[in-house]
């Protein structure tokens, strides 16, 4: 009967992995928002992760995977935009939200505009409004859609701050590609509505 089916479904639901880590990351994101990202004084301040991810025991400290289906792009995602992380994949800027989703978050994810023959974020500025960008982490896959593209100066910190009430990721890379990238291009993506549960 339906009672037995419900009970069986509840028994097969697996518990949330790494619950203490998730609590810590959610608390970090909340504090970042409540503090108005006061330590985000320049893009140089974004190299170090606000949270050390090694506590999870994940190999190489990879936090997750960034996927952009339109570009057939999948990259490892790290916390903190250090030179090593940027060489190995995409990196969340320190002093911006950890990419776990949730209201009042904006995880800014940087990538080189091509590196050692690999495209990395070379074609990210070509994304159009409505294109999908996904992040898979220890707790599942978060689905976002591109809502805006913007070109900024490297010192325009306000452009990458959390926007109240929204669940965002912002892809960031150098612009223009051909002339050494003196500016930055932002591709702002918002979480798909049906998934704003966390």
Predicted regions and their residues:
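Solvent-exposed, non-transmembrane regions of membrane-associated and secreted proteins
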Residues: 1-198
